[in-house]
């Protein structure tokens, strides 16, 4: 009987298991699906959080559900009433998607490319690839605004600045810009700003600059009314209106030119000289600063950063000390902390757009930190002698190639060169290019009668042989010597860089560049710096308007595939079919997400997306005979890049007021739109608002602008609250940029890379940016380029592709719902301790919210900075400080954070509120307390002397999580004023590192 019962029980259990499983899914359905990994809270936690918010008090319909939460958060008239159609919209596992993407990637042909033009093959040291590029400890941190927990990458970026300054011979460098072409455009604007003239302005461009650089300069100049003259530099005429000029050094055709006489003439006419240059060549060539350049810029890509089909790469930019305050981009400087220790920080931040808005030096608010750090580590690893050896090897290989080609009967341009050989091919040009392509070799067709070949550190003897064999197929003479090794011996005494061009000054002299040349030493240095920085590997980073969500390993994985990262951006179209397929897929998915009709992937950052979007609007208005429209309405709450971008495209900024609830004052908007109805070009609006609320009447706001002849530009900074729930195009916007490094999972990289593609309505699509080198990019009436690369930072687009495909329409919607849930859950937990500054009509927030700290300045002498620094003691990065409202904190948790992590931050903030109360009640001293003295470093805690009126444990281990695992700020609170008054922007003495 017992046996019978047991068998019956087993059979029943089997039956239930089979029945339960079969009702859920097929056994062939993927089990490694992504949404459950990307979204932090599980279903039980979601239900628990919904109950704590208790939306059922608003309605009994769908009580305490995500649907009900959204119903009372997003206005009904803009909600999307269908699922997003993300292509096939099928559930797919992570493993299978990578297999599918690999098949697409394999449609790209990885040929040997000797095209040059600012992009070169390079060897990324594996220790740098694995431990920086592929390391979440380096790619997940945010921009180092919280310097005390960012000392590692700040040190590395200071190394980058020092490297650039020493190579270029100019003492002041920034921490990188987006690409060489946009850096050149920034240099032009800097020349205008330095001139202090009211115009008119002219800028001279050497015709031997890279064509993509010339194109981008023209784009930037046109709306500002700057006259551009493209001529040979020897024909530069420095008339009274000329504020500056730019030359390529070495030239795009490879020639090394002596520019000293030209620079002297420029300075006599009060014009500045800009040199677009190549870092590796400067190991052998006289630095631009020594022959008279005032500004030097270029691409640091060949210092260990893969080609990536155009990016991302870190541009460099250096100038003279006296122009420091007009330098675009971020500058890393040295200051002191509260204990007098040397500390790194971002210097001269008052130049930036979040403070100076339309009067800022530039609209760029990001850099290429991750790539700059790779290039800096490349220099640290190789040092002066290593870089010289690489440069000499590249140069000697170019000499060998030139000699071999001469012996085949071809004419080689007889001018000094570094790495680029220009061959006169006459009527054989097309034939030669096809011949070489048949041998899987790409070269540059310089013009109809010549070919140029640019060599790099990856070139082997076999590559030289392949090139010579290719040329021998159509040579007038037989190949006398087939061995590059023999040519090496016979050309050993040939030098094409004369003494007048040769570098005499040392570089990379600081000990930091002479210590870490073994892999063990560099590995330890990289990890030593990494441990100083708080990234998403340590804790959530709750920065409002920054969307610090998961950067999943599966998303990052394809970035290192050679099919994506080893392709030159200017290869023939038939060699990049995989990229083409992926670009089209991403563009279609982004258009579906936003409700638009056209997409450009070219802008390299959100700021560039704003600039591109406004330029598209400007091009459209000009096409319909409305070029007089130049007024841009911008709410007072807007991010500083908005007015800075509007100013860049020649628009006049008119500020629109906000009401007491933080919403756009519709009456003021209507009045100003009607006042400027004949000149209104655009409204720039962020949605949901920068105050973290879905404003009512967004459709009406768009209608007001359209009724008065303007276009609506929507800033996509807060798109993480819209995806799958509402769409900018449906709301009434005409153009929107998307921060792929926020909403669509590209990592922030400690301050870049970013990507800011734009999506547009059909009437604007014809004007999407094109490219001077690669045809077929952009719309039918394409404006000129806004970036160096045709598709921006192409090699990080697989990250967004993988995210969109793995999430699908339902997953994307769920992610947005949970992002809004997480913010509302935190707000509900904190509302009894802090004032939540803005909420919607139902008391709910969007995906972020602001806590008000203004009252504590009077009651306890505590400000937002004190709370943010105290959070560092509790293993957290502080939220966004004092923006958009002074002395507040804006918190954005994102959908990727678990309930555990949300509670940990809430508990920390509640504990801080108790610490403030201790000051308010007199229990703690107003000027000597745990908040104003924060953060507390390990060095302070273990010191023999302890002169604080609270315990060491309260200072450093205030929460259970800090007892279990402690992240230590490396330095105490930094003296920003001291750093700006005593500006030091290159590596300090070695003793400061120890």
Swiss-Prot record:
Entry's Gene Ontology BP terms: glycine decarboxylation via glycine cleavage system
Keyword Oxidoreductase among UniProt keywords: yes
Transit peptide as recorded in UniProt: 1-21
Highest taxon of source: Eukaryota
EC number: 1.4.4.2
Gene3D superfamilies registered for this protein in UniProt: Aspartate Aminotransferase, domain 1 (3.90.1150.10), Type I PLP-dependent aspartate aminotransferase-like (Major domain) (3.40.640.10)
One GO cellular component, as annotated: glycine cleavage complex
UniProt cross-references to CDD domains, sorted A to Z: GDC-P
Keyword Oxidoreductase: yes
Keywords: Mitochondrion, Oxidoreductase, Pyridoxal phosphate, Transit peptide
UniProt subcellular location: Mitochondrion
Modified residues annotated as N6-(pyridoxal phosphate)lysine in this record: 742
Any one GO molecular function term: glycine binding
Catalyzed reactions: N(6)-[(R)-lipoyl]-L-lysyl-[glycine-cleavage complex H protein] + glycine + H(+) = N(6)-[(R)-S(8)-aminomethyldihydrolipoyl]-L-lysyl-[glycine-cleavage complex H protein] + CO2
Cofactor(s) listed in the protein's UniProt record: pyridoxal 5'-phosphate
Family: Belongs to the GcvP family.
Subunit text: Homodimer. The glycine cleavage system is composed of four proteins: P, T, L and H.
Function description: The glycine cleavage system catalyzes the degradation of glycine. The P protein binds the alpha-amino group of glycine through its pyridoxal phosphate cofactor; CO(2) is released and the remaining methylamine moiety is then transferred to the lipoamide cofactor of the H protein.
Protein name: Glycine dehydrogenase (decarboxylating), mitochondrial
Organism: Dictyostelium discoideum
């Amino acid at each position: 009987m017992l046996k019978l019962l047991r068998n019956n029980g087993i059979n029943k259990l089997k039956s239930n298991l089979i029945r339960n499983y079969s009702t859920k899914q097929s056994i062939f359905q993927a089990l490694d699906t992504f949404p459950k990994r990307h979204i932090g809270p599980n279903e039980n936690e979601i239900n628990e959080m919904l109950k704590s918010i208790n939306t059922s008090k608003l309605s009994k319909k769908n009580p305490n559900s995500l649907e009900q939460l959204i119903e009372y958060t997003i206005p009904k008239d803009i909600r999307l009433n269908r699922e997003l159609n993300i292509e096939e919209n099928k559930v797919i596992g992570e493993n299978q998607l990578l297999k599918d993407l690999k098949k697409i990637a394999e449609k790209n042909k990885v040929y040997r490319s000797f095209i040059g033009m600012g992009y070169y093959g390079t060897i990324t040291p594996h220790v740098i690839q694995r431990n920086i590029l592929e390391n979440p400890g380096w790619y997940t941190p945010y921009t180092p605004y919280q310097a005390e927990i960012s000392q590692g990458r700040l040190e590395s970026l200071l190394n980058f600045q020092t490297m650039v300054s020493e190579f270029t011979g100019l003492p002041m460098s920034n921490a990188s810009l987006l690409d060489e072409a946009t850096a050149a455009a920034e240099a032009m604007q800097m020349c205008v700003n330095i001139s202090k003239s009211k115009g008119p302005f002219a800028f001279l461009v050497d015709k031997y600059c890279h064509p993509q650089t010339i194109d981008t300069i023209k784009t930037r100049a046109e709306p500002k009314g700057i006259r551009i003259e493209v001529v040979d530099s020897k024909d530069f005429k420095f008339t009274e209106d000329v504020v500056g000029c730019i030359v390529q050094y070495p030239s795009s055709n490879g020639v090394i030119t002596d520019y000293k006489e030209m620079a002297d003439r420029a300075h006599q006419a009060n014009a500045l000289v800009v040199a677009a240059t190549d870092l590796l060549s400067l190991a052998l060539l006289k630095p631009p600063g020594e022959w008279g350049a005032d500004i030097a810029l270029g691409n640091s890509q060949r210092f260990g950063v893969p080609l990536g089909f155009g990016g991302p790469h870190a541009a460099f930019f250096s100038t003279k000390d006296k122009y420091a305050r007009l330098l675009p981009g971020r500058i890393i400087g040295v200051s002191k902390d509260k204990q007098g220790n040397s500390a790194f920080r971002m210097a001269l931040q008052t130049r930036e757009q979040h403070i100076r808005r339309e009067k800022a030096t530039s609209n760029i608010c990001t850099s290429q930190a991750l790539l700059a750090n790779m290039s800096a580590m490349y220099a640290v690893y190789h040092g002066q002698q290593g870089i010289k050896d690489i440069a000499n090897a590249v140069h000697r290989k170019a000499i060998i190639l030139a000699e071999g080609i001469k012996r085949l009967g071809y004419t080689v341009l007889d001018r000094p060169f570094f790495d680029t050989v220009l061959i006169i091919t006459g009527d054989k040009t097309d034939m030669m290019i096809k011949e070489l392509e048949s041998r899987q070799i790409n070269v540059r067709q310089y013009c109809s009668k010549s070919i140029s070949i640019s060599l790099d550190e990856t070139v082997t003897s076999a590559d030289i042989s392949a090139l010579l064999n290719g040329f021998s197929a159509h040579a007038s003479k037989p190949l006398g010597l087939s061995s590059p090794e023999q040519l090496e011996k016979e050309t050993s005494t040939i030098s094409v860089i004369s003494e007048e061009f040769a570098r005499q000054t040392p570089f990379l002299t600081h000990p930091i560049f002479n210590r870490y040349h073994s892999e063990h030493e560099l590995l330890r240095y990289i990890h030593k710096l990494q441990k100083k920085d708080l990234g998403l590997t340590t804790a959530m980073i709750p920065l409002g308007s920054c969307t610090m969500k998961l950067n999943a390993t599966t998303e990052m994985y394809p970035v290192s595939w050679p099919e994506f990262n080893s392709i030159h951006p200017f290869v023939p179209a038939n060699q990049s079919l995989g990229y083409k397929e992926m670009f089209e897929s991403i563009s279609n998915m982004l258009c579906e997400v936003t409700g638009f009709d056209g997409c450009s992937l070219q802008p390299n950052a959100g700021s560039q997306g704003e600039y591109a979007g406004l330029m598209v609007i400007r091009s459209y208005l000009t096409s319909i005979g409305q070029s007089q429209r130049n007024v841009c309405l911008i709410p007072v709450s807007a991010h500083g890049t908005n007015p800075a971008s509007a100013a860049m495209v020649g628009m006049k900024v008119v500020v629109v007021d906000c009401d007491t609830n933080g919403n756009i004052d519709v009456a003021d908007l209507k009045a100003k739109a009607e006042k400027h109805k004949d000149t209104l070009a655009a409204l720039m609006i962020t949605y949901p608002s920068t105050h973290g609320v879905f404003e009512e009447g967004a459709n009406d706001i768009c209608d007001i602008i359209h009724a008065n002849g303007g276009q609506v530009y929507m800033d996509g900074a807060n798109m993480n609250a819209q995806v799958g729930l509402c769409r900018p195009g449906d709301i009434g916007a005409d153009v929107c940029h998307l921060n792929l490094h926020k909403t669509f999972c590209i990592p922030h990289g400690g301050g870049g890379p970013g990507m800011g593609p734009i999506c547009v309505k059909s009437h604007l699509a014809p004007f999407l940016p094109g490219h001077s080198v690669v045809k077929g990019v952009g719309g039918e009436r394409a404006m000129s380029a806004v970036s160096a690369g045709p598709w921006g930072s192409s090699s990080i687009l697989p990250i967004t592709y993988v995210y969109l495909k793995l999430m699908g329409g339902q997953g994307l919607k769920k992610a947005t719902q949970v992002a809004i849930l997480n913010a509302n859950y935190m707000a509900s937990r904190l509302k009894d301790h802090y004032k939540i500054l803005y909420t919607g009509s139902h008391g709910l927030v969007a995906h972020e919210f602001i806590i008000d700290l203004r009252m504590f300045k009077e009651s306890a002498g505590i400000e937002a900075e004190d709370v943010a620094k105290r959070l560092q003691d509790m293993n957290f990065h502080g939220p966004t400080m004092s923006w958009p409202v002074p002395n507040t904190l804006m918190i954005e948790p994102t959908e990727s954070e678990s309930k555990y992590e949300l509670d940990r931050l809430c508990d920390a903030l509640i504990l801080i509120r108790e610490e403030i109360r201790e000051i308010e009640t007199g229990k703690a001293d107003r000027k000597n307390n745990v908040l104003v003295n924060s953060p507390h470093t390990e060095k302070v805690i273990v010191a023999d002397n302890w002169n604080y009126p609270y315990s060491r444990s309260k200072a450093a281990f205030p929460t259970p999580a800090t007892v279990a695992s402690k992240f230590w700020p490396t330095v105490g609170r930094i003296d920003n004023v001291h750093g700006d008054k005593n500006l030091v922007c290159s590596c300090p003495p070695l003793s400061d590192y120890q």
